[in-house]
């Protein structure tokens, strides 16, 4: 049973990583930034059965597949530490580090209320903050936030 699961996971991770790299190549995207948190699976509590399934998923393997496929395709792979990225307000350019109080807040699962009065997906807020840690605020402002792509995504 263990070998079957291993083969299943390896196949799935190869397919997922290939589809991501193909998307990046087709859209002429030259960098892939992936967030990483060292202890992110240690204190998880999503129910006994889900905990067992989730903690066993080898996300480090997915990152390694992404890295080597990006390198083969000429895409720069960046793995960046992601602490405090989901709590800080990306739209208000709040510094991404530990604070006593944060400008925005998560109003319910999956929804983040920015201090500028906008509602955005909480995962999008975290992803923008991970990217801000890598490229800086000025790059994010000119390419994403000020153009409205964050609040009105192109479909």
What function would you assign to each model-found segment?
Residues 52-53, 57-155:
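Positively charged, low-complexity nucleic-acid-binding target-recognition regions
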